[in-house]
Amino acid sequence: MQGRDACVALWLNLMQGEKTSMSTTVKPTEAGTAFLTTPVSESADKIFTLEQRDDEQRWIAESAATFAQREIVPNVEAIDHQEPGVMPGLLKKAGEQGLLSIDVPEAYGGAELGLLTSAMVASEFRDGSFGTAHGAHTTIGTLPIVFYGTEAQKQQYLPKLASGEWIAAYALTEPGVGSDAMGLSTRAELSEDGKYYILNGTKQWISNAGFADLMIVFARIGKERPSAFIVEANWPGISTGAEERKMGIKGSSTRQVYFENAKVPVENLLGEIHKGYKIAFNILNIGRLKLGAGAAVGSRNALNLAATYTTERKAFGKFLHEFGLIKKKLARMAAETYAAESEAFRTAANIEQARRSAGENTEAAFNAIEEYAIEASIAKVHGSEVLAYAVDEGVQIFGGYGFMQEYPIEKAYRDARIQRIYEGTNEINRLVTSGTLFRRVMSGKLDLMARFPTIEARVKSGQAPDFAGEAIPAELRTAVNALERAKDVTIYAAMRIAMKYMQAIEQEQEFMDYLANLLIDVYAIDSALARATQAVRRGDENSATHIKLAQLATWLAFSRIRLNLDQMIMTNINEDQVEKELARIRAYLGDFLLNGVTLQRELAAIVVEKRGYPL
């Protein structure tokens, strides 16, 4: 059974409650932040890569892509102009085809396929506006009830959300405080009869607000930390403002939501009282991860548009793809995308397996998501910035035509900008990445203290071992050794500077930014090199392409790593020690010697032949 017919059969089985092998197709979990201390030679066979998708996962992703091609693409103009009923109608159609139910347990009308599969599906919709609406519904709108709802709440709401009968929204952000869950001003006061919480306040920039039937709302009860509530949008006292006029994702509904003495039954408190901030943080981690996966696929789409255009457009008597600077752009777009998607789906698989291991234990489920907070933030930041790079270069390749609305790269450029802002700005996520690293060290979850003396001795000696050895394919050994040296100097520099700042370290935001940049590049190329190593070990027919993509991703990241290390040392080490520490780190880090121009030309040729992403 092939293609669409297989997809249809699979979805029929799923919607009828039949089990598939999908629910168990996940690699063993690696601990959070393990990428920093585990060599690629050990991790390569443990991590999940897209090449490990089974037939069912491929079919489901294909069905989402088919839905996008048949239902979304023909309606792009109507979506962008917010023609009445178009977006909610598309969401309901998606529900009819099972595309809203992937994360929902079977007991409540869902497919129960898990985070990994839902991330694959969410990344296939190819339209920023629909992707925003779909994510607001399935991730931040539905998952709080899946993860933290009572049995009664799940029975009451999840079947409607899974089918698309109801559409969900997530109301956290407020005027003046953004997404600071600890600074909310919306209040919830218990009524005199003890039957209701009375909500008063304003929420801002709420996706799906114009047509949502249900909202996850965060508000303070007294002066304590915020609590979460399941709120039906048609209850008295709830209203919305006008649609916001936006730069991009114009077709998504974005409004303010007002609560004026809105009565919410006490049984609609979600999770524990005063613990809503935990729900907010953990659901945001899932949202960040899915955003990263979607951004990576968005980069693929931008590359596909650009690569195809270079085979059609001529300048100075030659096709665009024949020019060296165009080859450079195509190759770099492909390599950066490869790294971004590698880290995103690796993280999705780890979170899914950890949650599955937690079972019905709510506290363990909280911890399972929190375990990968660093990786989720990295996936979001790196994925969104790779997308920004890809669409920007896409517009540049199209030239003046890329500035015209008739060409899809123009819309892709506008829609991409928001990705660096929502689910926490990239600046906030960088601080989350570095801050969480130090909290993991201080709690003993990450044993950098114990490792530091060995790493310090290596760095001071200037002699790095052969980290790769025979376990790594010959073509990747130089890149892997460069990566492992980068891990060592990242740990060395971070711990040296941490000893200077001690408890005040999180106030040094510039240092935290440098460190986050290092962690982002290390995780990205660790994921890329592990994926390429895995491809070679299993004899993948595209292993040569994997190698080129991973090598170029490493070469590009290595220069950024060197720059961030230099600037971190120059600005945070005592002045009389700077010269010595710079010399020490530079000597140990060394170089990653590679003819990047030759590699870019080789990779660009594959991109042009494929008319897009080479895998």
What kind of feature is each model-predicted range?
Residues 12-136, 146, 152-156, 160-163, ...:
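Amphipathic, small/basic residue-rich leader segments at the start of a protein or domain
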Residues 23-46, 120, 140, 282, ...:
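Glycine-rich phosphate/cofactor-binding loops in nucleotide/flavin-utilizing enzymes
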Residues 24-26, 48-53, 58-60, 239-341, ...:
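Glycine-rich beta->alpha junctions and the first turn(s) of the following alpha-helix
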Residues 76-82, 338-382, 395-398, 502, ...:
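C-terminal helix-coil-helix/basic helical segment that borders enzyme active sites and/or dimer interfaces
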Residues 133-152, 178-181, 190-193:
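N-terminal glycine-rich flavin-associated loop
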Residues 164-172:
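A short, Trp-centered hydrophobic/proline-enriched beta-strand micro-motif
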Residues 195-240:
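A short core secondary-structure module
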Residues 461-469, 474-615:
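C-terminal amphipathic alpha-helical interaction region
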